[in-house]
Swiss-Prot record:
Compartments (UniProt record): Mitochondrion; Nucleus; Nucleus, Nucleoplasm; Nucleus inner membrane
Higher taxonomy: Eukaryota, Metazoa, Chordata, Craniata, Vertebrata
Gene3D superfamilies, per the entry: Tetratricopeptide repeat domain
Cellular component GO terms held in the UniProt record: condensed nuclear chromosome; cytoplasm; cytoskeleton; microtubule; mitochondrial matrix; mitochondrial nucleoid; mitochondrion; nuclear inner membrane
Expression sites by tissue: Widely expressed. Expressed in liver, brain and a subset of small diameter sensory neurons in the dorsal root ganglion (at protein level).
This protein's name: Leucine-rich PPR motif-containing protein, mitochondrial
Gene Ontology MF: a single term: beta-tubulin binding
Species in which this protein is naturally found: Rattus norvegicus (Rat)
Entry keyword Methyltransferase: no
One Pfam entry name: PPR_3
GO BP: any one term: mitochondrial RNA catabolic process
Residue interval of the organelle targeting sequence: 1-77
PROSITE patterns: PPR
Induction per the UniProt record: Induced by NGF in nociceptors.
């Protein structure tokens, strides 16, 4: 008793301490105690539910610590980083009541990277290392805390008493044994004074090991310092006496408390309950619980959970059930219970954890079928014995708590690479009839494959064999073969270990692997000796790759002959002719044009050898190969392929061609006899139009003009429009109007007129046609609106800004189309094509201000993100947020980050507090991903929206499965099934049917019952009849999908029409080809084009589609084909876009193809509609010559053009900037040196300063400042070329992030600062880049020179200063920027 009386006397001798409010009471912090709730209650009353805060709220008050007055708040530093860390940890605790090690590690590493972690950050990290980490063992938690302490101290973090107290709390929660005296000495050495909280926790530390004497010493310190003794101290003393074996003294502490004027509260009673629980004294526990129930006190669920911990850890799990009966299972206590379960599993008390798990109300919730995943995952992590874990799984399933517990446990075991456990679980699943699939073993194989662990691979293959699972080809090729020196050694090792399957799978994988490595001799030997039937389709892709990697044509031929003649490989149907034909087609199709050209002789030899081997192909496939060879610009090979055609199967049907000669003769005869010729004339005109014979049709019209009728004119107008003949089309329209002013063309012909006139720059004439459509009430349907879009889009792709604006304004103002987002797309596209992102954004914003639509904002955002235009992104987001709401802004940003692959940023956006699902927006992006075959993007969308509030997860997975169906990826589809089960998702019937269809198509077992359609019988009865109305496709459907940019749907309609032998109009196919090319879907576009060419006589792409085709061909390095496409378009009198022609010329220049550039120059000569500058040819021909190392010739040509009296380009317009820039970018140093010499010579000898000035400016722009400075010193006249320098400044100021370039230019030529245009451009660029220092320097320089500054300059400077919170040293001009821009423009245009 003496040990008890000593502290009691001190307590009685001290002044009576008023009872602390419960909100300020600290938890007892006894060993192993769960984090206690901060209790807020009226005296003696039970708190309201909303006033009870979990320890999660501690994170919300770390910065202020208002509820912890005994620990003075340290000075706050690194606010934004701290807020970020606080948010991540706080969100985790709010959501789950715990923190994972991974999350804490990330926050810790991020904090360390900040360089100077703040005091609050350190405190936050330390407090997270205790009971908030239930998934870590006690020792690991403490080790983590020490790691954080040491590292932050190294980084310069200054610790105060709050940090030492936090460390003490972690020690207590983690039951860490340490010396309190040494801890005090450590604080003293750091010159840190302990406070009341320090002493309280040191007392708790002594008491946790039953050291009452040590606790008494600390109490003595507190008494001498006149520190109040709180309930927390008494609670610790209860624990100390109990662990010292003196339960009587422990119980007497309550009496001592009352004598000290402190009424024992819940914490004290809980400490006493834990003391009895550690002794296994259930009777005393019950007595105390009854006593508390009769008093004004109460226990919360987490208090009962703590008692369960005490019983369990002391070895008395038999009493847990009696405590569980006391728990009310309030919703807010569920995270505490789950964390208790994790803690028990960590402490190897899985049985008790399982008992608590089954007692939770969620386990009895019939709507939940996957509760307990967290328990199973942690059991896997903590290496719970397989037998016990499998038993848990079965009991959870039988209790209908977790319907897929074994599958989920297998998933966790595979993730954790726990082979033995995975095997045991798979055996349990197999015994229950669950199919074990090959890809389940891939996570186990990949670890061994990375380390070349042959034995590990063999062990996994043995397990697969035991499980009755045969590896597929992917398994062997991706995971097994890479571990061996050769396939033969792999076969030998597997045979030795009896892992070689009896099926053909290994052999097929062997062939594929040898083909991939180009070992054709091994393939031939295998195919000759193979005794099993193989599918040619299973070999085709690998053989193509093998052929391309081997140049042995004899082996090519022998393998092809073997495949053609051996029944094992080309079974019927379709037979060897079709199978080998498709192989040849795919072989050539897989090559680029340059590869085909390089292998032309080898391919010719190959085809000749096949002919000698009597290998045949069908005529249809021959035509396809011809098209490929023609596109690859090697038509010479066509005759070599023709000899392979199977002549016996050629369709010998004769086709008769109806000519116009008979009609023309009849017409002349009727005219001579004086008979009416109206009808036959119209018939002849229509026939010539169908033959696309425009020249002849116009001649006939001229000859019989007096007899022409309305129908003939209409047909001729349409014909001229198709042939891009704007002049004759307009003349015919005028004659049409004179013939009958009231006559009306059909909508398609009006639209065609608008299109051809707009394309040829006759915008006003096109607008007049639009006005006539309005005046004559021409019916405008969806097809016409779609055509309007294509007209505008074609102009946009050509870069014709004014054309797009004027035509769009006319169409909308006249009411011919509503100002929808789609019809407004080209207003933005025209700027995107020019890569003018600021203008594109402004155009989109202007559309919203005028029409309340925001076209292409997604594409604009994606471009801005790719370019890193943070200011413009912020501007866009501010506008969207203001006009459409913050939620719309977040979704726009989320989708843009996803599209550009910035998944981390996308995750941050979608985890924004308060964001909820918007089904329409989500479905829009899903459809976009499906249409563009963006598998990874859609997968990330589904993954990131898992926790999104009100997100229809079934719909998300349904979209993902739709994409997998297109790609035929059954493995990923099967993984989706597992993922849906993990999420406890009940899929809709359509989702199940879609998944089942994917698995069945790939001959895989379906692991669930497939719902049957109630109308199945009706559907099957219709399947044998002709296509139903719902199956019939129309051109309107195709054009509608094209208008909506649904390229995938439009292409599917085309395929369906192809099967039904439905042929659309030329314009429909041109539209579809253009759409597919705009989506970079080159292969499908060519399929559509080839079909149209074979089904519509004289089919040609329209101008816009031809331009897109040229760009696509250039992008794929099909330069010869692109040149042919350009020639064909020009032969049809089409006007390709300036962009398409320029891209082709530039690509040819980089390849050194001077001849082709000169050919293009001749082809476009005189075509002013293309608006191609002569400098495009001059620059690119010179560049091509330099690429061919003909530098002297290139320079001589340039000098000759500049010095010649017959100048083709005036000196002031002879710009070589592009040439200089490409030479610098391509690092062509000899060429750059000689160009520099040439430029200086022209300047010094001929006073031609533009070349040297252009070179100087390109050196500045590319960052070669020293070279630019040296050039300026050698040629000082550069500084006098004010007009050239001003134009450069103007153009540069319009580009983002170019302020440093202008700054460098002004440093090199200081006198430019006083040029009003230059300093205005400089200020504009400084403001755009937020370069305050440079802006200030420029302003101060100009004011010092007493320069008169215009209002626009001052307005820009004032806006910059206000943005950064600095005072404006003058009166800010009051009007808008637009006002001053207009004012300055007028002043410069009218200098008077």
């Amino acid at each position: 008793m003496s040990a008890l009386l000593r502290p009691a006397r001190w307590l009685l001798g001290a002044a009576a301490v008023p009872r602390l409010p419960l909100s300020l009471r600290l938890p007892a912090g006894g060993p192993g105690r769960l984090p206690s709730v901060v209790r807020v209650a009226a005296a003696g009353g039970r708190p309201a539910a909303g006033e009870l805060l979990s320890q999660a709220r501690l994170y919300a008050i770390v910065a202020e610590k208002k509820d912890l007055p005994e620990e003075p708040a340290p000075v706050r530093r690194s606010g934004s980083q701290f807020d970020w860390a606080l948010m991540r940890l706080d969100n985790s605790v709010r959501r789950t009541g715990r923190i994972t090690k991974g999350l804490l590690q990330k926050v810790f590493e991020s904090t360390c990277r900040s360089g100077s972690p703040g005091s609050n950050q350190a405190l936050l990290l330390l407090r997270s290392c205790g009971s908030l980490l239930p998934e870590l063992s006690l020792a690991e938690r403490t080790e983590f805390a020490h790691k954080i302490w040491d590292k932050l101290q190294q980084l310069g973090t200054v610790y105060d008493v709050s940090h030492y107290n936090a460390l003490l709390k972690v020690y207590l929660q983690n039951e860490y044994r340490f010396s309190p005296t040494d801890f005090l000495a450590k604080m003293e050495g750091a010159n840190i004074q302990p406070n009341r909280v320090t002493y309280q926790r040191l007392i708790a530390a002594y008491c946790s090991v039953g050291d009452i004497e040590g606790a008494s010493k600390i109490l003595g310190f507190m008494k001498t310092r006149d520190l109040p003794i709180t309930e927390a101290v008494f609670s610790a003393l209860v624990t100390g006496h109990a662990r010292a074996g003196d339960m009587e003294s422990a119980e007497n502490i309550l009496t001592v408390m009352k004598q000290a004027g402190i009424e024992p509260g819940p914490d004290t009673y809980l400490a006493l309950l834990n003391a009895h629980a550690e002794k296994g004294d259930i009777d005393h526990v019950k007595q105390i619980l009854e006593k508390v129930e009769k008093s004004d006190h109460y226990f919360m669920d987490r208090d009962f959970l703590q008692i369960i911990v005490s019983f369990s850890k002391a070895g008395y799990p038999q009493y847990v059930s009696e405590i569980l009966e006391k728990i009310t299972y309030e919703r807010r206590s569920i995270p505490d219970a789950m964390n208790l379960i994790l803690l028990l599993v960590t402490e190897k008390l899985e049985d008790t954890a399982f008992q608590v798990l089954l007692a939770l109300p969620l386990a009895r919730d019939e709507t939940s079928s996957s509760f307990g995943s967290f328990f199973l995952r942690h059991c896997v992590t903590m290496d719970t014995p397989a037998e016990k874990l499998i038993d848990y799984c079965k009991r959870l399933r039988d209790a209908k708590v977790h319907s897929s517990s074994l599958q989920f446990t297998l998933h966790c075991a595979l993730q954790a690479n726990k082979t033995a456990l995975a095997k045991a679980v798979m055996e349990a699943l197999r015994d229950e009839g669950f199919p074990i699939r090959t890809h389940y073993f891939w996570p186990l194989l990949v670890g061994h494959q990375k380390t070349k662990n042959v034995q590990g691979i063999i062990d996994i293959l043995k397990i697969m064999k035991e499980m009755g699972v045969d590896p597929d080809q992917e398994t062997y090729i991706n995971y097994v073969f890479p571990c061996f020196g050769s396939v033969q050694s792999a076969r030998a090792a597997l045979q030795e270990n009896k892992c070689l399957p009896k099926s053909t799978t290994f052999a097929q994988a062997e062939v594929r692997n040898e083909a991939i490595n180009g070992n054709l001799q091994n393939i031939l030997s295998f195919l000759e000796s193979n005794a099993l039937p193989f599918s040619f389709n299973s070999l085709r892709g690998s053989l193509i790759l093998g052929f391309r990697r081997s140049m042995n044509i004899d082996l090519w031929s022998k393998i092809t002959e073997l495949l053609y003649k051996d029944d094992r490989y080309c079974q019927k149907p379709p037979g060897p002719t079709e199978a080998v034909g498709y192989f040849l087609y795919n072989l050539i199709d897989s090559m680029s044009d340059s590869e085909v050209q390089a292998k032309e002789e080898r391919l010719r030899q190959y085809f000749h050898q096949l002919r000698e081997m009597n290998v045949k192909v069908s005529e249809n496939i021959y035509k396809g190969i011809c098209n490929l060879l023609d596109n690859y610009h090697v038509p010479e090979l066509i005759k070599d392929v023709k000899v392979l055609v199977d002549r016996e199967k050629i369709d010998s049907r004769k086709t008769s061609q109806f000519t116009s000669s008979d009609l023309e003769s009849t017409l002349e005869k009727l005219k001579a006899e004086g008979h009416p010729v109206g009808d036959p004339l119209k018939q002849l005109i229509l026939l010539l139009c169908s033959e696309e014979n425009m020249q002849k049709a116009l001649e006939v019209k001229a000859k019989y003009e007096s007899d022409m009728v309305i129908g003939g004119y209409a047909a001729l107008i349409n014909l001229c429009c198709r042939h891009d003949n704007a002049e004759d089309a307009l003349n015919l329209k005028q004659e049409f109007d004179r013939l009958d002013p009231s006559a009306v063309l059909d909508t398609a012909k009006y639209v065609a007129l608008v299109k051809v006139l707009g394309k040829h720059g006759r915008v006003q004439d096109a607008i007049n046609i639009l006005k006539e459509m309005k005046e004559k009430d021409v019916v405008i349907k969806d097809a016409a609106v779609l055509s309007f879009f294509h007209i505008l889009n074609g102009a946009a792709l050509r870069g014709e800004i004014e054309t797009v604006k004027q035509l769009h304004e006319a169409i909308v103002t006249l009411g011919l189309a509503k100002p929808s987002s789609n019809i407004s797309f080209p207003l933005v596209t025209v700027h995107l094509e020019k890569d003018d992102l600021p203008a594109a954004l402004e155009a989109s914003i202007a559309c919203h201000e005028k029409y309340k639509v925001l076209p292409r904002i997604h594409d604009v955002l994606c471009k801005l993100i790719e370019k890193g235009e943070t200011d413009l992104i912020q501007k866009a987001m501010d506008f969207v947020s203001q006009e459409q709401g913050e939620m719309s802004m977040l979704y726009d940003l989320f989708f843009a980050f996803l599209q550009t692959g910035n998944y981390k940023e996308a995750k941050k956006i979608i985890e924004t507090p308060g964001i909820r699902a918007r089904p329409t927006r989500l479905q829009w992006f899903c459809d976009r991903c499906i249409a563009n075959n963006q598998v990874e993007t859609l997968e990330k969308l589904v993954e990131l929206t898992e926790k999104l509030f009100e997100c229809d997860r079934d719909q998300m997975y349904y979209n993902l499965l739709k994409l997998y169906k297109i790609s035929g990826d059954w493995q990923r589809a099967d993984a989706v099934w597992n993922k849906m089960q993990e999420e406890n998702l009940i899929p809709r019937e359509r989702t199940l049917r879609l998944l089942a269809g994917i698995l069945k198509t790939s001959n895989q077992e379906v692991p669930f019952d497939v719902p049957e359609l109630w109308f199945g019988d009706d559907r099957s009865s219709l399947s044998s009849s002709s296509p139903s109305a719902g199956d019939t496709v129309t051109e309107k459907m195709l054009l509608s999908d094209c208008r909506l940019k649904k390229s995938k749907d439009a292409y599917n309609i085309f395929l369906k029409a192809e099967k039904q032998d439905v042929v659309f109009s030329s314009e429909a196919y041109s539209t579809l080809v253009g759409l597919l090319l705009s989506k970079d879907d080159f292969t499908r576009a060519m399929h559509v084009k080839d079909f149209a060419e074979t089904h519509i006589k004289g089919f040609t792409l329209n101008g816009a589609a031809s331009s897109l085709l040229i760009i696509a061909q250039v992008r794929r390095d099909y330069l010869k084909v692109a040149l042919e496409t350009l020639k064909a378009a020009l032969d049809l009198e089409q006007v390709p876009s300036e962009l398409a022609v320029t891209r082709l010329i530039q690509a040819l220049a980089l390849q050194g193809d001077v001849k082709s550039i000169e050919t293009i120059q001749k082809m476009v000569k005189g075509l002013d509609a293309i608006e191609l500058s002569r400098m495009v040819f001059i620059n690119n021909i010179a560049l091509a010559q330099m690429k061919n190392n003909e530098i002297d010739a290139a320079i001589e040509n340039i000098e000759h053009m500049l010095a010649s009296e017959n100048q083709t380009v005036e000196h002031q317009y002879f710009g070589l900037s592009y040439l200089f820039r490409k030479v610098i970018e391509e690092q062509m140093e000899p060429a750059l040196e000689k160009l520099s010499i040439m430029s200086e010579r022209l300047a010094n000898q001929f006073a031609l300063y533009k070349p040297v000035t252009d070179l100087f400016l390109q050196l500045v722009d590319s960052g070669k400042v020293d070279e630019a400075r040296a050039l300026l010193e050698r040629c000082g006249a550069i500084a006098e070329q004010t007009s050239i320098l001003s134009v450069f400044c103007l153009r540069t100021s319009q580009k983002p992030k170019k302020a440093p370039v202008l700054k460098t230019l002004l440093e090199l030529i200081p006198e430019l600062r006083e040029n009003d245009r230059v300093y205005s451009c400089s200020m504009k660029s400084y403001v755009a880049d937020k370069d305050v220092a440079s802006a200030k320097a420029l302003y101060e320089h100009l004011t010092a020179k007493n320069m008169k500054l215009d209002d626009l300059f001052l307005k820009r400077y004032a806006s910059l200063l206000k943005d950064v919170g600095e005072p404006v040293p003058f009166t800010e001009p009051p009007e808008s920027f637009g006002f001053y821009i207009k004012q300055l423009k007028e002043a410069r245009e009218n200098p008077s």
